[in-house]
């Protein structure tokens, strides 16, 4: 009901825009392997795998490493709360209050992700774990909006919808591949999974260079 009211309000506030017809040929069509598309899809797929492996392993990790602590369900739920809060705060700070360029958001966010995954695996204490989770939230809050914005800006107006569709289709890859990639690594050693994610995030720094992403 409230969603319907919000949709009606947004519709009433939309201003009419004169459409400009542009002749487009076959060369203007994009595909997932277009130069302006595939680097973003690779970035999104890696980011999705890192985030999905984290989400699916939080409960296991806390239980395996901090099983001697009391109120494990509370500790696990606090992890999700800290991750969500830090992500929301990061998105507000770096996209609204103190906006940064997309390239800077992608670069700094990737560095924070790599650093936090490493500290999470190396310092196996609950305090460092929570601190790493908050830094992870900041990193996710910087990279995710910058990625979608950069992809949109790299396309012509008539191709922005298709590009957004490609990006949306890649995001679930992390949850699909985590049981086959992340969990076997976790079974060997819980810390190895986060070292692996840290290495993947270092590759994001390489992918986010301006020569690869048009940001």
Q: Where in the sequence are the language-model features?
A:
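Short amphipathic helix-loop junctions that connect adjacent transmembrane helices
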Residues: 56-74
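C-terminal membrane-cytosol helix-exit motif in multi-pass small-molecule transporters
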Residues: 2-20, 208
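A late C-terminal transmembrane helix in Major Facilitator Superfamily
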Residues: 159-187
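Residue-level detector of conserved catalytic or cofactor/ligand-binding positions
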Residues: 203-215
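Structural signature of the two symmetry-related core transmembrane helices
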Residues: 104-118
